[in-house]
Structures are given as C-alpha cells and as structure tokens.
Amino acid sequence: MKNIVVLGSTGSIGVSSLDVIDKLGAGYGVLALSANTNADLLIKQMLKFKPRFVAVLNEDSYQKVKPYVPENTKLLPPDEDSLIFLASLPSADLIINGLVGAVGFMPLVTAIKNGKTIALANKEPIVMAGKSIMEECYRWKATILPVDSEPSAIFQCLQGTPAGRKEEDISRLLLTASGGPFFKYKGALSRVKPEAALAHPRWVMGKKITIDSATLMNKGFETIEIMHLFNVSLSDIEIVIHPQSIIHSAVEFKDGSILAQLSQPDMRLPIQYAVTYPNRMPSPVKKLTVKDMAKLEFAAPDFKKFPCLELALWSAQKEGAFPAVLSAADEIAVDAYLKEKILFTDIPKLIYSVLKETRSPSGKITISEAAEFDVWAREKAREFLANKKYKKTII
C-alpha cells in the first residue's frame, strides 16, 4: 500500500489527485488531507477516503469540519504547524504538495529533510530558493517528482537518459505555454475583468495559477523551476506558445534529436505519473487521436504584451533574492486583481515596483533568507498598493 498525503486537497490539484487515487484503487491509500476554507468539500473527502489525519488551517472551517470527523481520523490544530506535521509523517510514502503560493514552502522543506518523495505542483518554493532546496534534496536523499504538465513532460522525456549524463546530453529544453485566454486578444488588457482572465481555454485550475497563466507569469515561474529541477541555465530553455496544449514540452539533445511528451490537456495524467512512478497504469484520461494532432500551432511569446514573463526571466537571470521577491509580489498583485482593487495591467507594474526596491545578495540565498525576503516583499507590495505609487511605473 502506498500511503499518500494530499496537501491542499480541496484545490484543483488536490481534487484531481484524489480522483486519480480513487480510480487507481487497490494499492493506493489516503493517509492525510489538508485544506484551508472549503469545509464542505473537505467533509465529503474525509468521509469518503477516511484518512488517518486531517488538517484545516482556517478556524471557522475547522469548527465546521469538527463534528464530521470519523472515529479513526485525528483532526489537527488549525495552524500551519499541522502542515509541517503532515509533511513529516513517518508512514507517508508520497507527499502531494498542491498548496498555493508560499504557504507550501516550509512543508516542502520539511518533507525534503525527512527524505520523502514529493509530487510537487506548488512551484513557488522552488522559485523562491531553488538552489538551496535542491541541495537539501541531495543531502537528505529526497525525491521531487514534478506534477505541473510541462516540467512533468521534461522529466518523462529524460527518463531514458543516464542520470550522470542528463546535463551533458541536453542541448535545449522546449517549454510550451498555451498562451492563456489573451494570446490572440486584440482589445485593451487594462479593461479585462477577472472572470475573463479566469476563463482558461485549455486547463481547469485554481484561481491563482489561472491568472498567472493569463499574464504568462506561470511560464516564468516554470522556467525558474525547470532551471533548478534539471540543473540547466536560463539560456538552455526556449519558451514556445502552443495554444492546443497537446505537446506539453520537449527535450532537444546534443545530436539534434527531440523527444516530446504529448497528451490531452488533463492534469490527472501528470499527477498519476507521479503517484505511480516509476510505473505506468491505465488512466481515465481520453487518448489522443491523429485528428487531435492535425493542426498544432506554435509561436514566440510576446514580451511587450505580457511583461510579467519578462520580469520573471529577468529575475531568473539576476538570481539572489529576486525570484523570491517576484513570487511574493505576484501573489499580492494577483489577489488584489481578483478583488478588483487593481487592473490586469497593474499586475506587472506592482511587481516591478517591488523588484526595483529589492537589495539582494548575489548568488544563492538560503532557505531562511528566502523566507525573510518573502515577508519583506509582501509588506512592500501592500505598501505600494496602499499609496498607489505603482501606477506611475513604466516597464
């Protein structure tokens, strides 16, 4: 039996993960669940999967869940220490980190220090302190299995390459992006409302990552993530807009050969690969047909139209604290946009305003430094929101 902890079980990744586990059936069990505010869904999940542990971070949701806890399930206190506890459970064989934003940082670090295998959808911790986190992975013999479709595609394409030769054999990583809902949009992006930005043409995801996909910040985050997961430089990665989301990414090797991973755009497939790794099992995901692949489009990203991507690549090149600041400022900006406090086009302005104020050490930063810069950047972003200084920013 593979015992699985699902952090963020009521979010998009968590719901898909539980669907995968349910359909796999025998041999896969849910050891623990965590959620924040969606008490109703958590209650349903808890009663169906009967986990040994449940964590609810939000106090009101905690009180709502409490009467429904099964006899053999332990409800943990409503705080982030409970996430740390779940990430370090000795009996956990796999930790699925489907948390959103920096809240997943310390649970990831904890799981790594306990030598766990982590199915990682929460890319922000790698963005914040990728070099230090990967060093901890090697030190504690932990394993990170990428769950996002594009990093998972690259991971799968590299499975036939001997571990010691991966970096030596790679010529280029082709990182695909759908382009989001505004790839061909001709109108003024400043007028775009959250409901339009949340209408992703290919993927069903949580609100934060869907807005990041609309601004292309998500692709910038994935670029930074891929640099660290596969130990490649920024110059080794080429971002390609591919609206159909059939080719999830590709690897070009030194001899000119290109291996790509193709499938329907359904997050259950990369999740299942991480859950069953290194094995493959039958999946409920619809199979590709030749007709599906008849018309595949490709284009270069438009950095002028989507400045968030350029900010992310700039931060990746600068290294130090800049990626951590980028991640934190983006989280504040996206939240403000979803609450209609700022315009869609204000998102990169607010992020850039915070990046300009950053005084970063050169090179690698430690895990504790990343956490400190995360706090600082959030405070600075909120300050700019309050005084509206970001409005005058020209990118």
Curated annotation (Swiss-Prot):
Pathway: Isoprenoid biosynthesis; isopentenyl diphosphate biosynthesis via DXP pathway; isopentenyl diphosphate from 1-deoxy-D-xylulose 5-phosphate: step 1/6
Annotated GO biological process: isopentenyl diphosphate biosynthetic process, methylerythritol 4-phosphate pathway involved in terpenoid biosynthetic process
One example GO MF annotation: manganese ion binding
Names of the cofactor(s): Mg(2+); Mn(2+)
Binding site for Mn(2+): 148, 150, 222
EC number of the protein: 1.1.1.267
Keywords assigned by UniProt, alphabetized: Isoprene biosynthesis, Manganese, Metal-binding, NADP, Oxidoreductase
Residues annotated to bind 1-deoxy-D-xylulose 5-phosphate: 123, 149-150, 178, 200, 213, 218-219, 222
One Pfam family it belongs to: DXP_reductoisom
Alphabetical list of Gene3D superfamilies matching this protein: 1.10.1740.10, NAD(P)-binding Rossmann-like Domain
UniProt: NADPH binding residues: 10-13, 38, 122, 124, 206
Reactions mediated catalytically: 2-C-methyl-D-erythritol 4-phosphate + NADP(+) = 1-deoxy-D-xylulose 5-phosphate + NADPH + H(+)
Reported function: Catalyzes the NADPH-dependent rearrangement and reduction of 1-deoxy-D-xylulose-5-phosphate (DXP) to 2-C-methyl-D-erythritol 4-phosphate (MEP).
Family: Belongs to the DXR family.
Protein name: 1-deoxy-D-xylulose 5-phosphate reductoisomerase
Originating species: Elusimicrobium minutum (strain Pei191)
Gene name linked to the record: dxr
